Amino acid sequence: MPGTSVSDLPTTATAVDAPALLPLPVGRPQAPALVRGKLYIKTHGCQMNEYDSAKMADVLAASEGLELTDNPEDADVVLVNTCSIREKAQEKVFSQLGRWKALKAGGKPVIIGVGGCVASQEGEAIVKRAPYVDLVFGPQTLHRLPELIRARRESGKSQVDISFPEIEKFDRLPEPRADGPSAFVSIMEGCSKYCSFCVVPYTRGEEVSRPFEDVLVEVAQLAAQGVREINLLGQNVNAYRGAYGADAGEPAQYADLGLLIRTIAQIDGIGRIRFTTSHPLEFSDSLVDAYRDVPQLANYLHLPVQAGSDRILSAMKRGYTALEFKSKIRKLRAVRPDISISSDFIVGFPGETDADFDKTMKLIEDVGFDQSFSFIYSRRPGTPASDLEDDTPDAVKQARLARLQAHINAHAAGISQRMVGSVQRVLVEGPSRRDANELTGKTENMRPVNFPGNPRLVGQFVDVLITEALSNSLRGRIQLDDSAA
């Protein structure tokens, strides 16, 4: 985007003054016109992994001329981007690798690589157990894939790089390429909270925020390509502290997530902003103020609470009480009364009693969560919680999980039903998967909506009258204003 600048972006006054922004950089490597091979990527886990996989594809398209394929048998490079959150993640990875071993039959020079959090945990052990694996790389070293591939081909030896080079990953990625009207932008990596059950600090490292201006540049580049919705990503996204100002000879200042959202909202073309995943400890008044002041900030929040018992929250090392969590929700609903709130829950944490679980259900009732990601506790090696005694029968854990999910699902169904007859602002994402003659998009509270419409509307916001609530989606029709009637 030569000549494009974000230096004149207006900013809203906050506790931190926004910096003077520089022109957008040009000249980062782009995909060559010549396709020189095929790439297959299997992705497990969170939205951050989805983002990382997209960046792997961009890096290898730009440097190696690799084009994505849906069939690993057609690929010259096959990668699995792993997740270590759930139990037996390692075994699932080795099972996948065992199936891929046959791809090398007959001497075909296929490169097999393992990335993501399991790669960070296991490192050299992956190659020792599966010597046909060519590459092992962590979330922070995916940008080094071209060098790792070349080193593997030149040396004939497997390459392992699971280091934590902090922000270097973002400095060396190609310019972003839009793939539809909604895009993810990673604004930070890692987590420094060290919850007792979680492996993320050990697999992705401590919290490191991208510089404020770098994030704005990426968003502006995506907006110029037609992106209308930005999803800001981080393991603890609301801990964001993006540096700015040091280049002018002044001490660096730091923008929080609230200021970042305010500034992104003033980039031409950006009509909706989301962020995930948050930690309640970092849910600040600045962020509440952003919900009050920034209409582009979606009327939706995902804020993982994990449990409603203070005793269990303390054992999890979450750093807050159930009352403190509810206080933050009350502040938010004072400025956005109808906001939809989703959360994460861990059921059956070591030592959880019936009374503890009842407190979780009470919290769910008090807050009125719209959606949830809920799981039975999974012991992760190397975490403090893995040493705790766990004497709750599996059947009890299963029953608790079913009860929790049934309650939240019933509440969510009620919200969907009450949306019938309302008009919702929807970003048209593309044709419906169920009916190619219809369009699909999402409401602000993350509900898929299918409706008849002209394909030329893809990438635009439209008002949709909701006519029916189904189990996992809504149906509607485009609401025309009087001038279009």
UniProtKB/Swiss-Prot annotation:
In this protein, which residues make up the domain named TRAM?
417-480
Q: What reaction gets catalysed by this protein?
A: N(6)-dimethylallyladenosine(37) in tRNA + (sulfur carrier)-SH + AH2 + 2 S-adenosyl-L-methionine = 2-methylsulfanyl-N(6)-dimethylallyladenosine(37) in tRNA + (sulfur carrier)-H + 5'-deoxyadenosine + L-methionine + A + S-adenosyl-L-homocysteine + 2 H(+)
Q: Which InterPro entries match?
A: Elp3/MiaA/NifB-like_rSAM, Methylthiotransferase, Methylthiotransferase_CS, Methylthiotransferase_N, Methylthiotransferase_N_sf, MiaB_methiolase, rSAM, rSAM_horseshoe
Name one process (GO BP) from the record: tRNA methylthiolation
Q: Name one GO molecular function term.
A: 4 iron, 4 sulfur cluster binding
Give binding positions for [4Fe-4S] cluster 2: 191, 195, 198
What compartments host this protein?
Cytoplasm
Summarize where [4Fe-4S] cluster 1 binds, as residue positions. Answer: 46, 83, 117
Give the SMART domains listed for this entry.
Elp3
Q: Which UniProt keywords apply?
A: 4Fe-4S, Cytoplasm, Iron, Iron-sulfur, Metal-binding, S-adenosyl-L-methionine, Transferase, tRNA processing
The EC code for this enzyme is 2.8.4.3
* Annotated Radical SAM core domain residues: 177-416
Q: Which family does it belong to?
A: Belongs to the methylthiotransferase family. MiaB subfamily.
Quaternary structure annotation from Swiss-Prot or TrEMBL: Monomer.
Role, per record = Catalyzes the methylthiolation of N6-(dimethylallyl)adenosine (i(6)A), leading to the formation of 2-methylthio-N6-(dimethylallyl)adenosine (ms(2)i(6)A) at position 37 in tRNAs that read codons beginning with uridine.
Protein name as it appears in the record: tRNA-2-methylthio-N(6)-dimethylallyladenosine synthase
Gene transcribed to yield this protein: miaB
